[in-house]
Structures are given as structure tokens and as C-alpha cells.
């Protein structure tokens, strides 16, 4: 359904009574920490798997003889699959009502696809060497197979990631969404630490009896972790059963409508969700080049000052980059554990402050048609929605609050270390500023250890990126009563994460082509300039984030 002007002007209020009467509105029990760990542990496997691509992808492609501008084009696989695959997976899983649930079948299939793609990535040169005798043809086919493996791996990662995020929204109460997403951030942090630690260790020596290369051992370990963690989530987490609905459109029709009415879907988002998406757009424009090129950047600085005889030692340079990412992951994991405890718990002040919110410019009356988010004709009427959206909502648990009061130990610790006035939006804004400063600092960096220190500091910002936007977004979905369409809603959110990465890739390609025109030395400064452009985008994300600040900030 498209958004029409009359519908926007004559919307009806989605009241708490309507939400309560919805057949999708059912009681969700309070979830224990063990349940949340089982729910989010699949993200650990996903991140460890993705660390293969992040830590070794670019150096691996360089080792195959690929030039930088071509590697940037290949890395467009990630955002493209994010734009296409996550919404499709969300729409399909929203419609599934199988015995084992809506999300878990997709997670299991994607984990098997990820295992196959890792095998293809690690053994592509060996496969081509076995089949082809012509060296030139062998190299070309190896590059093709490596590219296919990267695309398949991105599809698998996106499906598991989207399904897990939707499962969090489906299975956890609104007042526990922050805690659940904090656990998700921790799992991603642990996956990062393990992944980059494995990338730094000489795996080919540790597992010398296998006679595998470093990348091949890494791919085997990543495959095991992906299948194991997804299996744990599938076994120990039960999904909610939603009432069956009669869909007025086919699956293909709904997918086609999603992409053709993307603009209307974005326009129909409530104020807070829309602002979160805008922040994510500029944030990921900056993060994408960092994640894919920082290993190479650190390696370049290492080679510039490498000991005599090691000037072309790209294996050691890659390990130096992996060590930087290991520090990055450790700081990120520590921050994901500590930062939530520093947030101010404003529940006691919520009622007093909410009365002032109605007079604030960010307390906005919106009339949105959410028909394009419905799952079928029997879905509770969500079209013609008029809602009063305030970042502080009366009679709702604080969306900045992380831990339920039942977690007495953690609440006690948090009460001792809380920073007055520190809320999720303020912390998120600060993280963008910090990341932007770090990227611009590449102007002054000269050695690999300086770059490693800078990368480690960025772990603070990455911790916030993995946790805060998802906490705000999923909590808002729950409060709006849109859980039955959470897969599609998260698909819209992911478009704002993936689209800027495509744009960032195009800009990086232009920068690389210009640098190749002047000289073909791989150790030029073009990657540093791509990182600096990302830093400028981080400041734009901070500017957009101001709309989410507390009303008295």
C-alpha cells in the first residue's frame, strides 16, 4: 500500500487500547541472562566468521594480483547483499509459521551456506591449481572463485544477522531490549576478539599437522564456530507463535512492493526510528572503509619502516594489521561491558519530565501510513497511524535504561558508577565525534604502532555502534506494537546501513583510481584519504544524532 496524502492527514491514533487488543500483543516473560546469552550467541559465530573477511579479505585479494580499485568494487558485495538480502530474508521469515519458528530455519540454512563459502575462499587457489595447467587462466579463475566466496559469505552473514536481530525483537520484552542488545554487542565483541586473535596467531604453525595455510585453518575454525553457535541458539531459544494471517499479496509481490515503495516506507517511519536511520547512514559511510581497509593501512605503515629484508613481507604486515584489530576488539568488548553501567537511570524522573516533553520541538505529532509494513489482511490495522512521538514517553520504561530492577547486583554496581546526565543518545553522539577525530588523526600518523593505538581507541566508538542504535530501534518497535513485522522493519533499518557503504565504495574506487594514475606503488596514501573522508561523515552522524538528545540537553 502506498502512502497517500489524505491518509497522512486523516490518520487515526494508535492508542494503548488498540495495541492491547491486538492478537499479536501477548505476554512475554522476563528473560534470564542465560536465555539472552543463548539468544545472542549466534552473533558471536557470525562476527568471528566475518573477521575472516575483514582481517584477511583485502590482503588475500592483493595476493591474487588484484589492484586496489578492483578490490573496492568486490567489497561492494557486503552492502549490496545487505540492501537486497536482509529485507528479503525479513519478509520471508515474517511469513513463515513453521514448527521450529520463523527465524531459526533461515539461520540454519545460512550457517551451512557460510560454511561452504569459507571452504571456497580458503581452497580456491588449490582447486584451480588442480584443474588448470595454464597459470594465467588459473589466476583469473581463482579471483572469480574468491569473489563468489565473498558474495556468498556476505549473504550468509546478513541472513543470520537479520534473523537474530528479528528474533531479539520477537522474543524479548520492550523493557529488556536494551539488555538483550547489550548482550548482542558483547557477543559480537567476543567474536571480534576471537577472530582477530586467531588472525594474529600463526595458525599454520599451531596446526602444522594439517598442512594448511593460515587462511585455510582460519576458515575451518570460523566454520565450526558459526555452525556451533547457530545450533545453540536454535536448540535453546523457543520462538513465539504468531496467529496465522491471510496475505493479500504473494511473497514476490510483497518483496517487489517493499523495494518499489521504499521511499514511502521510510517516510512512514515514526520520528525516532527515522532519526536513528539517518544517523546510521552517515555513521556507516565512515565505518565501512575502516573495517575493510584498516588492516592494509596498518600493514602499509609497517612496511614503510620494516626491518631490512622484510620490506615485502605482506604476511607479517597483515598480522600487524590483525593485531591492531585484536586491540580494537578487546577495547570494544570491554566497553560493551562497562559503558551500559555508566548510563543514568532516569526512570524515577520519567513522569515529571514527560509533562515537559509535550512543549518541546522534538515531541512531534506524526501521521503515518504503515500499510506497507503490514503482513496481511488480518493483521491489526496499522495504517492511518497518528502518534505522538517523544523520546521520553510517559508510563513507558525508560528506553535509556539498560537493566531491569530484578538484576539487583548489576543495578547496585550501576548505581555506584553512573554518570549523571549520560544517556544513550549522548553516548552515541560522543562516539561519532571520537571516531571522526581518530580518522582525521591519520594525517599525523607515521608508524604502525601509532596506527595500532588509534585503531584500539576506535573500539570505544564501535562498541556504541554495535549496541545503542539497535537498542533504541528494537525498543521503539516493541512499544509501537510492530513485532509481527519486525523482520521488515529491521530490513528498512538495514538499508540505511548498507546504502552508504555502496556510496563509500564508489568514492573509495575513485580515490584509488586517481592514486593509481600517479604511481602504482601499493604503499601510497590513498587508503588514508579514504579513512579521512569517513571521519568527516562521522561528524555528520554526530550532527544528526542531536535530534535524539534529551529535551533538556
Swiss-Prot record:
CDD domains: MFS_SLC45_SUC. GO terms for biological process: maltose import across plasma membrane; sucrose import across plasma membrane. Residues 1-33, 94-111, 162-186, 238-280, 344-424, 474-494, 543-553 are cytoplasmic. Residues 1-26, 368-399 are annotated as: Disordered. Keywords: Membrane, Sugar transport, Symport, Transmembrane, Transmembrane helix, Transport. Gene3D superfamilies: MFS general substrate transporter like domains (1.20.1250.20). Pfam families: MFS_2 (PF13347). It is a multi-pass membrane protein. Residues 55-72, 133-140, 208-216, 302-322, 446-452, 516-521 are extracellular. The chain crosses the membrane at residues 34-54, 73-93, 112-132, 141-161, 187-207, 217-237, 281-301, 323-343, 425-445, 453-473, 495-515, 522-542. GO terms for molecular function: maltose:proton symporter activity; sucrose:proton symporter activity. Residues 1-21, 374-392 have a biased composition (Polar residues). One of its GO terms (cellular component) is fungal-type vacuole membrane. InterPro entries: MFS_trans_sf. Its main location: membrane. It is found in: Membrane. Responsible for the transport of maltose and sucrose into the cell, with the concomitant uptake of protons (symport system). Belongs to the glycoside-pentoside-hexuronide (GPH) cation symporter transporter (TC 2.A.2.4) family. This is General alpha-glucoside permease.
Amino acid at each position: 500500500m502506498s502512502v497517500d496524502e489524505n491518509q497522512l492527514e486523516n490518520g487515526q491514533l494508535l492508542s494503548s487500547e488498540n495495541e492491547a487488543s491486538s492478537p499479536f500483543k501477548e505476554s512475554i516473560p522476563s528473560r534470564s541472562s542465560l536465555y539472552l546469552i543463548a539468544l545472542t550467541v549466534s552473533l558471536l559465530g557470525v562476527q568471528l566468521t566475518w573477521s575472516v573477511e575483514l582481517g584477511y579479505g583485502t590482503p588475500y585479494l592483493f595476493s591474487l594480483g588484484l589492484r586496489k580499485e578492483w578490490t573496492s568494487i568486490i567489497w561492494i558485495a557486503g552492502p549490496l547483499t545487505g540492501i537486497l538480502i536482509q529485507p528479503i530474508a525479513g519478509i520471508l521469515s515474517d511469513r513463515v509459521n513453521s514448527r521450529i519458528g520463523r527465524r531459526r530455519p533461515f539461520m540454519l540454512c545460512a550457517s551451512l551456506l557460510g560454511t561452504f563459502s569459507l571452504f571456497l575462499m580458503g581452497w580456491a587457489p588449490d582447486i584451480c591449481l588442480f584443474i588448470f595447467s595454464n597459470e594465467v587462466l588459473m589466476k583469473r579463475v581463482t579471483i572469480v572463485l574468491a569473489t563468489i566466496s565473498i558474495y556468498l559469505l556476505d549473504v550468509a552473514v546478513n541472513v543470520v544477522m537479520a534473523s537474530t536481530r528479528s528474533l531479539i525483537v520477537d522474543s524479548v520484552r520492550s523493557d529488556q531490549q536494551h539488555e538483550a542488545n547489550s548482550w548482542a554487542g558483547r557477543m559480537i565483541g567476543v567474536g571480534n576478539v576471537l577472530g582477530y586473535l586467531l588472525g594474529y596467531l600463526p595458525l599454520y604453525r599451531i596446526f602444522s599437522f594439517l598442512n594448511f595455510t593460515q587462511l585455510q585453518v582460519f576458515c575451518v575454525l570460523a566454520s565450526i564456530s558459526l555452525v556451533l553457535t547457530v545450533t545453540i541458539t536454535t536448540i535453546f531459544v523457543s520462538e513465539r507463535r504468531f496467529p496465522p494471517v491471510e496475505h493479500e499479496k504473494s511473497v514476490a509481490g510483497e518483496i517487489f512492493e517493499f523495494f518499489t515503495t521504499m521511499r514511502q516506507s521510510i517516510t512512514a517511519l515514526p520520528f525516532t526510528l527515522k532519526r536513528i536511520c539517518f544517523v546510521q547512514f552517515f555513521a556507516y559511510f565512515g565505518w565501512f572503509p575502516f573495517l575493510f581497509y584498516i588492516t592494509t593501512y596498518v600493514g602499509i605503515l609497517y612496511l614503510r619502516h620494516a626491518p631490512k629484508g622484510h620490506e615485502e613481507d605482506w604476511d607479517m604486515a597483515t598480522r600487524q594489521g590483525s593485531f591492531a584489530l585484536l586491540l580494537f576488539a578487546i577495547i570494544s568488548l570491554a566497553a560493551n561491558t562497562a559503558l551500559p553501567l555508566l548510563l543514568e537511570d532516569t526512570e524515577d524522573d520519567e513522569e515529571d519530565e514527560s509533562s515537559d516533553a509535550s512543549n518541546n520541538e522534538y515531541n512531534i505529532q506524526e501521521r503515518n501510513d504503515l500499510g506497507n509494513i503490514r503482513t496481511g489482511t488480518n493483521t491489526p490495522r496499522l495504517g492511518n497511524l497518528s502518534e505522538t512521538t517523544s523520546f521520553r514517553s510517559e508510563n513507558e520504561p525508560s528506553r535509556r535504561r539498560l537493566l531491569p530492577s530484578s538484576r539487583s547486583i548489576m543495578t547496585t554496581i550501576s548505581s555506584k558508577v553512573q554518570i549523571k546526565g549520560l544517556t544513550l543518545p549522548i553516548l552515541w553522539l560522543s562516539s561519532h565525534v571520537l571516531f571522526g577525530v581518530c580518522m582525521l588523526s591519520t594525517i599525523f600518523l607515521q608508524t604502525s604502532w601509532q596506527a595500532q593505538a588509534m585503531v584500539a581507541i576506535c573500539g570505544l566508538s564501535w562498541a556504541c555502534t554495535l549496541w545503542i542504535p539497535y537498542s533504541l530501534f528494537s525498543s521503539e518497535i516493541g512499544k509501537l506494537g510492530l513485532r509481527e513485522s519486525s523482520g521488515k522493519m529491521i530490513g528498512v533499518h538495514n538499508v540505511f546501513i548498507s546504502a552508504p557503504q555502496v556510496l563509500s565504495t564508489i568514492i573509495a574506487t575513485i580515490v584509488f583510481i586517481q592514486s593509481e594514475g600517479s604511481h602504482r606503488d601499493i604503499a601510497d596514501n590513498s587508503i588514508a584519504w579514504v579513512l579521512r573522508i569517513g571521519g568527516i561523515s562521522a561528524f555528520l552522524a554526530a550532527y544528526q544524532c542531536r535530534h535524539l538528545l534529551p529535551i533538556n540537553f
